[in-house]
């Protein structure tokens, strides 16, 4: 082996070996335990960023480790290739989205290969290819036939910049998640899939996901939002109309003082027809943001409709108000308002001088003070007629039962989850396979006409979708009847909801999935991706799997057994203020910094002399110009160094702070491993280790080696605390670096240790370990070498160090045989002169002994 560690010499050579040998290509093998490790597929934006590198390194470490355990490991990769950014880039670069996307895929594929990830490239998919989305279209038509798909005109979140519909989850603080434009409300026809039919399953099956982060499961539970309550029917004064509301607090029903309805509710529209001011208010409400999350913070506005509802139990007339905080597509579009015991209702009632009636006593049994805020806690009912004195649960049931008995109420389980709107008014997506015939009938595209292919050779004007702008594209016939194709395309979450299953059989042409392959590999054993996907992708991913199961395509209930959500990658961010007061962000690579003695940045300038403001560590992003190009780092330090730093600098699920000094440290460590191996191999052949004749010092070192193997095995496999696994190997390396190399036994022990170290580091730094394994004379390629197994006998300690206390104060430390009895330990302590002087002339009244650790003698 060469004397110096030169990653540029090693890594290309090893990657070529993997490619030629097809090392990571796998097929189904019933004789082996399978392991399917998957990282969330990337969007081909053009270049990898450090977030990608972290995600895929974690997945690769797990995959390589599981392969060393003898499992048949599938680790595929592909491209989530449809989506809006391609349209923007196409307009900007005067091209079409397809060539831009395919060029990016090619570039990023080479970047992934440079990092040494062990993918089965034969399974690569790009979701924009017809051989992928044809099956998505086929499945959609099957869902339509089953009654799981419908079209309706719906109030949607509309981004006026991107000219597309956004899911509620895609609206952040009233703005588009992608371009930050203020979101508007618009009503357009949309295709929906009935995810609400699966709400109960999606909720209950979270309990089976024992190896998913609690945070993700909690977010999904909250998003599904199961509640138990009562649907209540109110009569409307001088009208045949009925008003239905849903409440989870029937115990407060006697405190209702008004009813609020959505601007789009039939009663609002009826009243607005003869009230111009109300009509203006309704129009204003219907053109504002609709994301539920915004409702809590926005100003509550309302207007009286002039209509009244009748309280079903008291007969009171309750004013009906149109209000901007009621959503037409949640529940019934109407809410009963109990301002005494609901913060939002109190805020609205206070603003518009509506009555506030308390019906729940304070915790101390007194009437609550509602002058400053509502009392939202549950408690004993009062002011509630026959229900006075009942506690929350009894009050809930008594009032619910009475409403049911009177025929004006029905107990109901409700969900916050809404059906999945999958229509997008964009070009670069999979066409929705539906056709509107001449007579207005809507039918699915026949199977023999699938896929409905998206034309790729198009001109983008940045305004309208090429397939909407081309009337010829939409023309088709079904059973000889002319019709027009749907020109909306699928939400790109459709593609990413089932890609994991297609990886099991990407070339299969006889159906959406090959049942044998899908059921061999699925469910995914380990899924890796960001927490930001908790309630969109991960919900749709779970939902789609249940749809596939119910179509007989897979036989498991959930798509992934274990989920790891990696933290974000942060980097220093710097800026200076431009002439117009704007912040001009400067890359940390271009910042010249001064630090204090604690390493904190105290001053920074750029090459042009601008004094920079240090904005702290923040997520690597284009907007703050603080991304670090992985390729630059790989060229400078090698892929193994970048991978090692990524896995060592922070626990996988925590944020990682990018520090080049840390990268340099990882590089120095690999050089030390290389140097130790070089020095060892330079001394020539090694004889086998004779375990029976090891010295105490050699036994101690071998004990440390096997304890390290046991710890690293647990850290990588069960605990997934990869940083502590690396730290343990580093600690062992320090001991190996100090170990004498005088005798044959010393060298034989070093050989055992280095072969183990190289295998423990292999999942993290595979290129250098591949070379070191060969240099050390390891059997075969390290790619097929087994994971080291800790020798239980080697870890057994012959002796123990026991701390001796007298009256709780440490007076000495003694070494005793590992199997020494309490009596033997006491006798040995009495012989220790540092201890003996405290026992002279006193009586031992009590002995506290923690075997092998502590002896405390209480004397008096």
UniProtKB/Swiss-Prot annotation:
E.C. designation(s): 6.1.1.4
Keyword Lyase among record annotations: no
Residues the record lists as binding ATP: 622
GO molecular function, one term: leucine-tRNA ligase activity
Gene Ontology annotations for the cellular component aspect, listed alphabetically: cytosol
Gene3D superfamilies: 2.20.28.290, 3.10.20.590, HUPs, Isoleucyl-tRNA Synthetase, Domain 1, Valyl/Leucyl/Isoleucyl-tRNA synthetase, editing domain
Keyword terms, alphabetized: Aminoacyl-tRNA synthetase, ATP-binding, Cytoplasm, Ligase, Nucleotide-binding, Protein biosynthesis
PROSITE patterns referenced in this protein's UniProt entry, alphabetically: AA_TRNA_LIGASE_I
Record InterPro entries: aa-tRNA-synth_I_CS (IPR001412), aa-tRNA-synth_Ia (IPR002300), Leu-tRNA-ligase (IPR002302), Leu_tRNA-synth_edit (IPR025709), M/V/L/I-tRNA-synth_anticd-bd (IPR013155), Methionyl/Leucyl_tRNA_Synth (IPR015413), Rossmann-like_a/b/a_fold (IPR014729), tRNAsynth_Ia_anticodon-bd (IPR009080)
GO BP term, pick one: leucyl-tRNA aminoacylation
Record's catalysed reaction(s): tRNA(Leu) + L-leucine + ATP = L-leucyl-tRNA(Leu) + AMP + diphosphate
Motif mapping: 'KMSKS' region: 619-623
Annotated Pfam families: Anticodon_1 (PF08264), tRNA-synt_1 (PF00133), tRNA-synt_1_2 (PF13603), tRNA-synt_1g (PF09334)
Alphabetical list of NCBIfam families matching this protein: leuS_bact
Similarity field: Belongs to the class-I aminoacyl-tRNA synthetase family.
Name under which the protein is recorded: Leucine--tRNA ligase
């Amino acid at each position: 082996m060469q004397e110096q560690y030169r990653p540029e010499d090693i890594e290309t050579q090893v990657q070529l070996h993997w490619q030629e040998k097809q090392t990571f290509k796998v097929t189904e093998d019933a004789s082996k335990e399978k392991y399917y490790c998957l990282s969330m597929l990337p969007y081909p934006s053009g270049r990898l960023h450090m977030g990608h590198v972290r995600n895929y390194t974690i997945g690769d470490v797990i995959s390589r480790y599981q392969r060393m355990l003898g499992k048949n490991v599938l680790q595929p990769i592909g491209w989530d290739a449809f989506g809006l950014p391609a349209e923007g880039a196409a307009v900007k670069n005067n091209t079409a989205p397809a060539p831009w996307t395919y060029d990016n895929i090619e570039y990023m594929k080479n970047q992934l290969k440079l990092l040494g990830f062990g993918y089965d490239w034969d399974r690569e998919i790009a979701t924009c290819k017809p051989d992928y989305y044809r099956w998505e279209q086929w499945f959609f038509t099957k869902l339509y036939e089953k009654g799981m798909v419908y079209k309706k005109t719906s109030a949607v979140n509309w981004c006026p910049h991107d000219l597309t519909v956004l899911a509620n989850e895609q609206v952040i603080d009233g703005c588009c998640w992608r371009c930050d434009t203020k979101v508007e409300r618009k009503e357009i026809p949309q295709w929906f899939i009935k995810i609400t039919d699966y709400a109960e399953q999606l909720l209950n099956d979270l309990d089976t996901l024992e190896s998913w982060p609690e945070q993700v499961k909690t977010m999904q539970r909250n998003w599904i939002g199961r509640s138990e309550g009562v649907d209540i029917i109110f009569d409307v004064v001088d009208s045949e109309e009925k008003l239905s509301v849903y409440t989870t607090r029937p115990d407060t029903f006697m405190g209702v003082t008004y009813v609020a309805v959505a601007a789009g509710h039939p009663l609002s529209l009826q009243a607005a027809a003869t009230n111009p001011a109300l009509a203006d208010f309704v129009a204003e409400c219907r053109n504002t943001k609709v994301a539920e999350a915004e409702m809590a913070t926005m100003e509550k506005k309302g207007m009286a409709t002039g209509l009244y509802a009748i309280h079903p139990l008291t007969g009171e007339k309750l004013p009906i108000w149109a209000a901007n905080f009621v959503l037409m597509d949640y529940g019934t579009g109407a809410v009963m308002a109990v301002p005494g015991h609901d913060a939002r209702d109190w805020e609205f009632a206070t603003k518009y001088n509506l009555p506030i009636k308390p019906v729940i006593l304070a915790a101390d049994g007194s009437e609550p003070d509602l002058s400053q805020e509502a009392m939202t806690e549950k408690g004993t009912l009062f002011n509630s007629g026959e229900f006075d004195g009942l506690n929350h649960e009894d009050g809930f049931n008594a009032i619910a039962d009475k409403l049911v008995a009177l025929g004006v109420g029905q107990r109901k389980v409700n969900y916050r989850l809404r059906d999945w709107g999958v229509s997008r008014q964009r070009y670069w997506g999979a066409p929705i396979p539906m056709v509107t015939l001449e007579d207005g009938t809507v039918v699915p595209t026949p199977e023999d006409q699938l896929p409905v292919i998206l034309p790729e050779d198009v001109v983008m004007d940045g305004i309208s979708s090429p397939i909407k702008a081309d009337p010829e594209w939409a023309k088709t016939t079904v059973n000889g009847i002319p019709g027009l194709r749907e020109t909306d395309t699928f939400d790109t979450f459709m593609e990413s909801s089932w890609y994991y299953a297609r990886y099991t059989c990407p070339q299969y042409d006889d159906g959406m999935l090959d049942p044998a392959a899908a059921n061999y590999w699925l469910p995914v054993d380990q899924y890796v991706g960001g927490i930001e996907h908790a309630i969109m992708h991960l919900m749709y991913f779970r939902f789609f799997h249940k749809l596939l199961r119910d179509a007989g395509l897979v036989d498991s209930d959930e798509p992934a057994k274990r989920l790891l959500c990696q933290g974000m990658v942060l980097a220093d961010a710097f800026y200076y203020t431009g002439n117009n007061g704007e912040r001009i962000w400067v890359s940390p690579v271009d910042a010249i910094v001064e630090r204090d003695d604690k390493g904190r940045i105290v001053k920074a300038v750029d090459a042009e002399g601008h004094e920079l403001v240090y904005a702290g560590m923040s997520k690597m992003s284009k907007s703050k110009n603080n991304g670090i190009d992985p390729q630059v780092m790989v060229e400078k330090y090698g892929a193994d160094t970048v991978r090692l730093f990524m896995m060592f600098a922070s626990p996988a699920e925590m944020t990682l702070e990018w520090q080049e000094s840390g990268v340099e440290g990882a590089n120095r460590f690999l050089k030390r491993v290389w140097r130790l191996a070089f020095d060892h191999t330079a001394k020539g052949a090694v004889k086998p280790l004779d375990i029976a004749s090891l010295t105490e010092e050699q036994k101690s070192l071998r004990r440390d080696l096997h304890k390290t193997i046991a710890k690293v095995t647990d850290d990588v496999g069960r605990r997934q605390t990869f940083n502590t696994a690396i730290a343990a190997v580093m600690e062992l390396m320090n001991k190996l670096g100090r170990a004498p190399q005088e005798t044959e036994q010393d060298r034989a022990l070093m050989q055992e240790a280095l072969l183990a170290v190289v295998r423990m580091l292999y999942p993290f730094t595979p290129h250098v370990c591949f070379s070191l394994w060969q240099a050390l004379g390891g059997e075969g390629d390290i790619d097929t070498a087994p994971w080291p197994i800790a020798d239980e006998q080697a870890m057994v300690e012959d002796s123990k160090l026991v701390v001796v206390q007298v009256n709780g104060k440490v007076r000495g430390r003694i070494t005793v045989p590992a199997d020494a009895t309490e009596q033997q330990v006491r006798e040995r302590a009495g012989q220790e002169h540092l201890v003996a002087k405290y026992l002279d002339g006193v009586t031992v009244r009590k002995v506290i002994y923690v075997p092998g650790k502590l002896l405390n003698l209480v004397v008096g």
